[in-house]
């Protein structure tokens, strides 16, 4: 069973709901998921949260990371960088149709987009089932490719 660390912003109820829904979908598809928001009590220290997340990335076979927002979440960016340094495949996705990259055509910062093994952006008005299918296809592509673009 492939183990996935699911990275992304988790600071609003909407973000937490999206993350949890994606995690349950991937579990139904046979993946083992580590979703940080489900493992870190609010009273943990910053150091404990950091160490837990790093250990979870070490445990995972790959990282799947949400790049939504005006600029992708800084914690998510670190998690991707750490996974890249460890040689793990990374899938980056963006459901936010605003442009947040280094150039007009880039969806987000080039250090994130170029470190991804596979990535995709979701066009405006994409149906949830289309997003889920695209996610599965991209994860499979990344696993087949291993690390690197």
Question: Language-model features: where?
Answer:
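Conserved catalytic or regulatory cores that recognize and/or transform ribose-phosphate-containing ligands
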Residues: 1-149
């Amino acid at each position: 069973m492939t183990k996935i660390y699911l990275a992304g912003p988790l600071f609003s109820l909407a973000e937490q709901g999206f993350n949890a829904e994606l995690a349950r979908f991937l579990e139904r598809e046979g993946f083992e998921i580590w979703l940080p928001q489900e493992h870190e009590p609010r009273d943990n220290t910053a150091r404990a949260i950091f160490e837990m997340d790093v250990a979870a990335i070490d445990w995972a076979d790959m990282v799947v990371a949400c790049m939504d927002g005006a600029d992708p979440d800084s914690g998510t960016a670190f998690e991707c960088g750490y996974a890249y340094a460890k040689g793990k495949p990374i899938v980056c996705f963006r459901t936010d149709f605003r442009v947040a990259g280094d150039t007009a055509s880039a969806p987000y910062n080039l250090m994130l987009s170029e470190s991804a093994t596979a990535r995709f952006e979701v066009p405006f008005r994409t149906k949830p089932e289309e997003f889920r299918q695209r996610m599965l296809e991209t994860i499979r592509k990344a696993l087949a490719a291993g690390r690197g673009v």
